């Protein structure tokens, strides 16, 4: 299986495909944590975008401070580190810049799928925008993308079940209004 992943990633890299990597660590599926760490480290160099949580940051880098880990992570192809911190929000790091989106206070029912919905929403924004050069995207655009992803993930936690919690645009807009947010995610700063 690992060889198939490597071949696919090599092909995607040659074709210029944007690669996002969320390690989404599942310790229960591995007999050996060191083997898991080595597998993650083997695939890190393929990522243009790396999404990490607190637990993943420490496991992969041995550090608990994202700022201290950046030089280790922002190298090779990697252009963005997205660091999610649950209810505290998320930050996007790229060389010399940090963009932060505060978390939303919601009544949490189930956190299953929150990280997946976050990165899915962020990638949706990138694809919708159509800008293939990650370094050319403005801080304002990235702020909008991060805010949208953060809102989407917050919504996901308010409903039981990962798939049942996936919102369409109308549901997300109603959720945004229920939080009394006046931000508009259509700005192209």
Name each model-derived stretch.
Residues 1-72, 88-89:
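Conserved beta-alpha-beta core of the PfkB/ribokinase-like small-molecule kinase fold
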Residues 10-11, 64-189:
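Conserved phosphate-binding/catalytic region of the ribokinase-like
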